[in-house]
Amino acid sequence: MLVKCVLLGLFTLAVFFPRPDQLVRQIPRWKNPDSLIETNAPFLTEINQKIDEQLKPEATKNEEMKAVERFVYREIKYGYDWDVWGNTDYWPTLAEVWQNKREDCDGQAVLTASILRSRGFTDVRIVGNLSHVWVAAGTNEVMSPQADKNFQRVDGKLKVRLPGAKTFLLTWAHINKFPAARSLLLLLAVLILTLHPVWDVKQWWMTFGIGAAGLLLLYDWGGKYLQSSAVGASLGFWTGNLLVLLAIGLAYYTKRPANQPG
């Protein structure tokens, strides 16, 4: 059982983080997102000139932040980390964001925070939750802020709290954007390791079919939830999760030879 758990853990890491080098670099960035804020990049000068051209002389700080937000959204096209970097999550450096010109919310936040700090917003910080990352400076926030803040640095310390139900559902709904092939590979790995040493073809296809049906329902629910959170934890959400768990449960409780407890 221990060997199976280790193998499953390693395979799960490979599915979610196929680039281990990026994962190693990512760990300290998770601990201190604000460490990615830079102000000495040469290209920031040109960026600030372009932003200044869009601002009125009497622009307020909030208007200035909004101008930076518009610039970042215009210049950095949205792309999920698994499409851009391969890994499920990766916080890029400022140079990587500007070079690729394609990032998800964390990369967009890194660029936004760096621009703002270079413009004199000394209290700028990166804020986020389980599903989204944005930027705050004082009491002002940009980059589609959300009410539920799961992490931010306050007085030099990283403050972390558990996500609320809505944040959890929004995060889970993004399964709709996750490569289906990876989800199926993970399901296959779980079922193979759980069924072993039983190799009954009928049992195998039954459990895989049930699990795949569950994933299909979850992908469908996720797409609907991302269009409108009013969908909530609907029947598709509960049925999808239950079918995946049922498949794993059936695989685990499959009758095994007396001398092979699994």
Model-derived segments and spans:
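N-terminal Sec-pathway targeting helices
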Residues: M1-G9
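Low-complexity, compositionally biased segments
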Residues: I51, L55, G107-A109, G262
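Alpha-helical transmembrane segments of integral membrane proteins
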Residues: C5, A67, T207-G211
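C-terminal domain-boundary segment and adjacent tail
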Residues: G249-L250
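Cysteine-centered nucleophilic/redox motifs
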Residues: V68, W98-G128, V135
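Small-residue-rich transmembrane alpha-helices that serve as helix-helix interface/gating elements
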Residues: F237-L246
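His-Asp-centered catalytic microenvironments across diverse enzyme cores
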Residues: L130-G236, T254-P261
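Secondary-structure boundary elements
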Residues: T12-E103, A136-K157, L169-K177
